[in-house]
Amino acid sequence: MSFRSIVRDVRDSIGSLSRRSFDFKLSSLNKEGGKSRGSVQDSHEEQLVVTIQETPWANLPPELLRDVIKRLEESESVWPARRHVVACASVCRSWRDMCKEIVQSPELSGKITFPVSLKQPGPRDATMQCFIKRDKSNLTYHLYLCLSPALLVENGKFLLSAKRIRRTTYTEYVISMHADTISRSSNTYIGKIRSNFLGTKFIIYDTQPAYNSNIARAVQPVGLSRRFYSKRVSPKVPSGSYKIAQVSYELNVLGTRGPRRMHCAMNSIPASSLAEGGTVPGQPDIIVPRSILDESFRSITSSSSRKITYDYSNDFSSARFSDILGPLSEDQEVVLEEGKERNSPPLVLKNKPPRWHEQLQCWCLNFRGRVTVASVKNFQLIAANQPQPQPQPQPQPQPLTQPQPSGQTDGPDKIILQFGKVGKDMFTMDFRYPLSAFQAFAICLSSFDTKLACE
């Protein structure tokens, strides 16, 4: 039996995962009465206990299973063929564990495979090339992964969607993993971005904290999951209230026409992540559905006898994680909500200033062919606070270096995120480490919003 026939047989034995519904039950609800819920699609809810019939493929020897998954990972490297890797991860627990062991994160592999990849940092040595399609009639935005080098393409791997909601005093963009269901009440909701009245400041919210970081470990009590526990929980603040970044646009007090100036304070990413050997702490292992988060918050608040704090503020005043989680020891590296870290400041991004072209009489940036239409929305972000380089020994003579795979050189002006227009309602978005696809998409959404005093 050929390798492809094995994969086809496995896929057929479990059905088409994108169209098949599974009955499931939440283990946390079984303790309170075993209430049943409806059905779900796709593989977004890894926390769900899925009841499927055991197949002979579940009893494969680990050595054979490892060889099968490795060969599949190497052969199916791009979408849409990469859906076979996702299908194999959904066969059973042993297959899923093997896929998690072999399939690397986007930071190492440069590939987006599972939904959790959307919240993990991008590749270090290349850029992840995506494009955004805007629908003005429905006020929606869809993010796709580029499958070809062509700029104006209609096909791509869908990643995220967003919907603009205009309020009296602010604008909100709801971000979802579903192309059509864009709602905060959906299990595919993963975050949002909210602006102030002038459209000069934006706050990016995530649905779940960085529970793998020292924040969660510092306050985790015995008997409660570190994934959902916090020392003080506000039942008035739903999931999606974790502030992970703030985007600010400078006011144009002179009123002259010119490029925008923006800064992004990435509160969940320390500046040390750009140093040699640096990492982004608190990377998620899974994306927790909203229903599980809400249920966990309700169970914690009802059973805990600790003091509960209520936060009714929706403004841009600073609030610290230490106010929510209590005092922390000095040796713990904890990212504060206001954008400070005990041992390392947060990563701050700023737009690369364009140069004035005398012949064209316009401001120009080198997008290396990825942007073709002039627009005030176009920008390139670089690190504003580069870490100090470590002293290095005397270098030995080396041959000529090869060009970077991303087409960009390392150094102080290394572009971390670039966004620009290529056609009507079509924009490119290229990002790299340490930003994730979710963070990059949220930052780009802020550029779409109306700026009353920035240009």
Curated annotation (Swiss-Prot):
Pfam families for this protein: F-box-like, Tub
Tissue specificity as recorded in UniProt: Ubiquitous.
Residue spans of biased composition, Pro residues class: 388-402
Region annotation (Disordered) ranges: 386-414
GO MF assignments: transcription cis-regulatory region binding
Any one GO CC term of the record: plasma membrane
GO biological process, one term: regulation of DNA-templated transcription
Domain of life: Eukaryota
Domain F-box: 54-112
Family the UniProt entry places it in: Belongs to the TUB family.
Name this protein carries in UniProt: Tubby-like F-box protein 1
